[in-house]
Amino acid sequence: MSGSDGGLEEEPELSITLTLRMLMHGKEVGSIIGKKGETVKRIREQSSARITISEGSCPERITTITGSTAAVFHAVSMIAFKLDEDLCAAPANGGNVSRPPVTLRLVIPASQCGSLIGKAGTKIKEIRETTGAQVQVAGDLLPNSTERAVTVSGVPDAIILCVRQICAVILESPPKGATIPYHPSLSLGTVLLSANQGFSVQGQYGAVTPAEVTKLQQLSSHAVPFATPSVVPGLDPGTQTSSQEFLVPNDLIGCVIGRQGSKISEIRQMSGAHIKIGNQAEGAGERHVTITGSPVSIALAQYLITACLETAKSTSGGTPSSAPADLPAPFSPPLTALPTAPPGLLGTPYAISLSNFIGLKPMPFLALPPASPGPPPGLAAYTAKMAAANGSKKAERQKFSPY
């Protein structure tokens, strides 16, 4: 890779560990990974930085670079020159058309962006002038997170200098409060509550019109930190706490937990429910998953867990693998309908958007297509146990039907 070290200057290395997250499109990710992973392997070896790329089939992926400041800047330098190399190799549409600049999109906690912009924009203006790179801080939060995208574009040397200065600012100004990281695979669906149909989740590929999808995407760009389900009109989660228990096969529990607990943590944040996964008993083929919270929290958590299980089964062709799966939970067309709503919630139909659960504006009511008579062939039914008020457990068979 010619010129991959061109933007680096010798600096005393700080004794800290720096983590830099970048948002990349699929084509950029493919370029960084290279054939059989050769490019990313070379970047790791030459920079000594730890580089991970998020899994998933969505158009965007998160590339995380961790290491000493020198290692991270070296890796960013090699990535910038690799992307520049790709732009040079791309065929030009016309002889007089200049090729676009190299662009990196950094993902930074919103609480640190104020320091990056500076009073009346003085800091970001200084960075632009001293580095020659274009820097743009997004006005909106990334969907379902407390992070913003910071776009840096220009020639590789200018980008490297700019990233150095940005990192210096964020190291001097640690994030305030908890940070909800951006996950590109996370999108919004719509939860519907009706007296006759109970809880259901409407994915954005179901009966939602294109206009409603557009509005939902616009709302998602104004996401705020996760809120409790108490924002739903007419519901008081504090007075209707209950628990529900699932039995999940051992070979599918991995897709519910996720890598280093990322998936179960995401489900807890999205639903507001407390979720406990029991230890594996000797000789048992299933694990107990207990969900505790308000009826709305339980229903939403149950849907998200069921979506993980059905996605894992469909991905493996119906035959569970021996290794735990680490799968994203996209809100694709829902495969299941959730349990009947509690008696206290029945009555006038409500429309509760998933954005409402995390503090956004409610969506208009969406009509729910009638359910088909039964589940499709091969769709497993899960046994759930609801804890009664007197402490006894009543087992009931829950069969799920598609819309």
Curated annotation (Swiss-Prot):
UniProt xrefs under Pfam families: KH_1
Keyword Signal tagged: no
Gene3D superfamilies, alphabetized: K Homology domain, type 1
Ranges for domain KH: 17-67, 101-154, 241-293
SUPFAM superfamilies: Eukaryotic type KH-domain (KH-domain type I)
SMART domains: KH
Xref: InterPro entries: KH_dom, KH_dom_type_1, KH_dom_type_1_sf
Gene Ontology MF, one: DNA binding
GO cellular component: cytoplasm; cytosol; nucleus; ribonucleoprotein complex
Main location: cytoplasm
Keyword tags: Cytoplasm, DNA-binding, Repeat, Ribonucleoprotein, RNA-binding
GO biological process terms on file: negative regulation of mRNA splicing, via spliceosome; regulation of mRNA stability; regulation of transcription by RNA polymerase II
UniProt-annotated location(s): Cytoplasm
UniProt-listed PANTHER family: KH DOMAIN CONTAINING RNA BINDING PROTEIN
Cited function: Single-stranded nucleic acid binding protein that binds preferentially to oligo dC.
Protein name (record): Poly(rC)-binding protein 4
Organism of derivation: Homo sapiens (Human)
Gene, per the UniProt record: PCBP4
